[in-house]
Design a protein with these regions (language model features):
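Domain-level signature for proteins that mediate thiol-based redox and metal-cofactor handling
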Residues: 1-106
Length: 106
């Protein structure tokens, strides 16, 4: 897989991540800044590092499964490896301007 193909897959991944929501927050996980890394590998697997807005997120399992299902539905993705990371700790500065406006922080 060449670099251009990887970039196209990464763009499609971002598009599907924008359809994943924490059930308690009306902003998608991409704009919340919960995705730290997306790496598309030559074999079509994707390594994704993500976090939660709270360490004890009650919807964690639901969100991770939604992310995995949607990533694996992207054309060109063979499998998704989702790594939960908590450093750096998520804070409001990681949100997009759009998310800050939606949530009344801007």
């Amino acid at each position: 897989m060449n670099q251009e193909e990887k970039l196209q897959i990464q763009e499609r991944i971002v598009d599907v991540l924008k359809t994943v929501y924490d059930p308690e927050i009306p902003v998608d996980i991409w704009n919340l800044g919960m995705i730290y890394k997306i790496e598309v590998n030559d074999d079509g697997t994707v390594d994704l590092d993500m976090t939660f807005t709270a360490l004890n997120c009650p919807a964690a399992d639901f969100i991770v499964e939604d992310v995995r299902t949607k990533l694996e539905s992207v054309e060109g993705v063979k499998a998704a490896n989702i790594n939960l990371v908590f450093e750096p700790v998520w804070d409001q500065s990681m949100m997009s301007e759009e998310a800050k406006v939606e949530l009344g922080f801007a």
